Amino acid sequence: MTSLQDRIGTLRTGKLSPEFFSLQADPIFWQSKAGELHRAALLLAQQFFEDTEALRAALKALEEGQTADLPSQPTSVMSQFVLLAAFSLENLFKGLVLYKEPNLVDGGKTSGIMRSHDLLSLASRAGVSLTPEEHRLCVLASSAAVYWGRYPISNSAEVSLQQTKITGHSVRVFDELFQRVTLLFKERFHTRTRRVPQPGA
């Protein structure tokens, strides 16, 4: 195990046994990580809305002659909202997949679809049905996860983003999908719990 600790923080890394790795891959931990990312995504969305309203108010003041100063436009964080939303849904879907296919974590490694960022494929494998709007969100978010949510260019000029515009409605669609899939998580968890043999049974 290696350890690094200073004023920046603490980081410890080391090799895990395959058994302990499998324990850490339990679906409940995927749900927990999804919750962290869900909250962070919504915080970014809220900041975007506040920035937008502040800019509108500043422009209105300029038009009405209340100020002569040109308003500054803060750096947008909306694409990062989509990025974190994608990672949140990815964790939820992968956790549900593992309820059905725990063998996808074996020998201290993940395999197959567990290494994918394709939200449509993950949702299908997890048994999650999507509305047309949720389907569209997953397509958009999947592309953000591997490209425009993180980098200014793609890996190839042949597949490059020409324009993107994210609406406030996407935040609601994401949040409602997250809440719905979280309920599926609870159902799967209780189903699994009922299947665990009780002592003396």
Model-derived segments and spans:
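Long, charged low-complexity segments
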Residues: 1-42, 101-201
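Short, contiguous, well-structured surface segments enriched in hydrophobic/aromatic residues
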Residues: 21-72, 84, 91-100
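Acidic, serine/threonine- and proline-rich low-complexity regulatory regions
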Residues: 70-77, 131-134
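Extended HEAT/HEAT-like alpha-solenoid repeat tracts in very large eukaryotic scaffold/adaptor proteins
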Residues: 77-85
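Alpha-helix boundary/capping segments in eukaryotic regulatory proteins
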Residues: 78-79, 99-103
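Generic hydrophobic/packing signal
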Residues: 80-81, 92-95, 148, 153
